[in-house]
Every structure is written in C-alpha cells, then in structure tokens.
UniProtKB/Swiss-Prot annotation:
Keyword Cytoplasm among record annotations: yes
GO cellular component term, pick one: cytosol
Gene3D superfamilies (alphabetical): Translation initiation factor 3 (IF-3), C-terminal domain (3.30.110.10), Translation initiation factor 3 (IF-3), N-terminal domain (3.10.20.80)
Pfam families xref list: IF3_C, IF3_N
Function as written in the Swiss-Prot or TrEMBL entry: IF-3 binds to the 30S ribosomal subunit and shifts the equilibrium between 70S ribosomes and their 50S and 30S subunits in favor of the free subunits, thus enhancing the availability of 30S subunits on which protein synthesis initiation begins.
One MF annotation (Gene Ontology) recorded for this entry: ribosome binding
Presence of the UniProt keyword Glycoprotein in the record: no
Name assigned to this protein: Translation initiation factor IF-3
Amino acid sequence: MSKENEVLLNEDIRAREVRCVGDDGTVYGVVSRDEALKIAEKQGLDLVLVAPDAKPPVCKIMDYGKFRYQQEKKQKEAKKKQKVIEIKEIKLSIKIAQNDINYKVKHAVEFLQDGKHVKFRVFLKGREMSTPEAGVAMLEKVWELVKDVADRDKEPLVEGRYVNMLVTPKKG
C-alpha cells in the first residue's frame, strides 16, 4: 500500500486526544486515544484515523475489514462504469484523389456508427508546409461528406506538419 493510501488504526494512531465518532454516528466528542481504543474494543471494532489533519484528529470506530472491502468494491464499480473512448485516425494528403477520399470517408462513417471518434490528419510534405490552408481546405471537403453522421469536436487546426480535425458521433 502506498504512503498516501495508508490508514492508521488502533495503536498506530499517535495523537493523545482524538475526536471520536461511532460506527452508528454516535459522537463521543474529544477523548483520549486510550479511551477511544477501549470503546472500540468493547464494541469489537477498530479505531480508524479518518482526518489526521484536523485539530484534534478525527477517528471513527468501525469494522476496518468491512470498510476496506466496500471501498475496493466501489472502486471496481467506478472502473466498470468508465467508458474508454477509442479514436480512429485517418491520414490524408493534399494531393489525394476524390475516389480515395470517398473510400476513407466510408470507413470513417463506419467508425462513427460504431460510436468511435475519428481524427482526420493531413500530412504536409515539403513545399506544402508553406500553404497549410490547402490542408484545411481538404479537411473542410471531408467535413462536408461526414457532417450528416458526425459532430465536429475540433475545427481543422495546423499542428506542426499536420492539419488535424476531430469528429465525434452525432448524439441522438
């Protein structure tokens, strides 16, 4: 366990006086650590330091094993609910033929229908670097073909040797 996530319990708590709260919400007030330990022991539970920075530190009387299990369960649930967004990248060039554009747009539409985000990239070679507007124009041309099924997340943007545009599936 890392230092940040380490929880002090029972005899590991160094404070002389603590503000003690019971598992059921009972407030015992400010008591000595030893007295709080006796209360916890009497109930068959652990004394857990929950707010070490407070003056005096706050301790809660609880079943630590059960508490840790519930925390891990919550973390697993949160991890399950996270949705990983997949971004597909489609590379184009300024001198691409219309048929090739149609082919790549067809694939982009399939990705968008699957719920994936699509990043269009135009690579600027050699002298094309002096006219990045041509790359922006290419992406505007592509946008006209995909705007029925997509929302534009990012306008065409020049980033180094690339002109990028990010589109996401249309909502609804």
